[in-house]
Each structure stands twice: as structure tokens, then as C-alpha cells.
């Protein structure tokens, strides 16, 4: 339950972060890509007619969470710190740094990139829930969807980075991606610590 509750905060906060990246970006074609990405996340795509937060709410039902439980959850201190970090990166830094910070977190779900580690985060978490909780992949619509959706999202902004993150900009973007991954690790570690305390 802790995982899904904190994930719901992460997913909702990303909408703000992508909006900051779009607001900072002067390139109309990139803004259009961001809006396309956000339409899939917030409105509808092939995985949900109601946006991806709906997938988390549906996934919560088999483990005893109501929509209210998910929507009214409070952040762990580490979740709050990570969300503040991403918010600052995407609002105060350049649009390319913000784009890199957001895009790298999509890569965490991509089985193609992380096959040597047993797959992306969504696949590995889903497998744990199947093995330890006796659920099926049909009970896990969020992780099932993100195994596919984030393949497209992983690839979506690579041409943009290849075009605009050149010269000295390349190192800046790589550093932003590293910092974003550090935030992601802190976010995940906080969830793990909270789960250990109740087990």
C-alpha cells in the first residue's frame, strides 16, 4: 500500500514538472511533444480511458486501497524531498535539463534498457506482487501499462536531446539526468525504509 500511495504522489507531481519543462522551452515542436506525452498520461491512451492515475487507483483495489486512500495520501519525508527536487530542477533549470531529468525516469521502466538487471521497475515490481501477493498481471494495470507506455516515452525525447543537447550542453544534460536518478533512488529508499518499519 505504501508503494502505491507514494507512487500516486509521484505521478501527480510529474504533471507539474512536465508543465514547467514546457513553459521553459522555446521550441514549439518540443512543446507539442510534451503535450502529446501529457495527454496520454492525464487524459487517455491505449491503457486507460481516464489517464494513468486511474491505473494506480484500479491497482489499489486488490490490496485494499480505495480511491480516497490513494488521492488523500500524505508524502513520506523522502518523497516530499524528491518531489521538491524535481520541481526545482524542472522549473529553475534550463528546459533541456528539465527534459533530461524527466526523461531519465521514464527509462527506469524500460525492459529493453534494463534487461540485464531483470527488466524495468514496473516489470520487477509486478513480478514481486505476482509471486508474493498471489495477484495476476491483470490485477496490476499500472505496472502492466507502464511496461509498454514507457518504451514509447523513453524514445519520445531522444531526438530532441540529440538535436539540442550538443557541445557543452551535452555534459549539462547528463548531469541533470544523474541528479534526477539520485532523487529517484532517494524516493525509492524512503519507501523501502517505511515498509521495513511496518514489517
Annotated model-derived regions:
Residues 32, 38-142, 182-186, 193-197:
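Active-site-proximal alpha-helical scaffolds that flank and shape metal-associated catalytic sites
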Residues 5, 32-36, 73, 144, ...:
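Short, charged, amphipathic alpha-helical segments
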Residues 134-177:
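Accessory, usually C-terminal, subdomains that scaffold auxiliary metal cofactors
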Residues 18-22, 57, 126-130, 158, ...:
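Amphipathic alpha-helical segments within well-ordered protein domains
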Residues 164-199:
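Acidic, carboxylate-rich catalytic segments that either coordinate divalent cations
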Residues 9-14, 50, 117-123, 151-153:
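Short acidic alpha-helix initiation/capping motifs at coil-to-helix transition points
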Residues 1-26, 30-33:
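Long, hydrophobic/aromatic-enriched structural stretches that serve as scaffold segments
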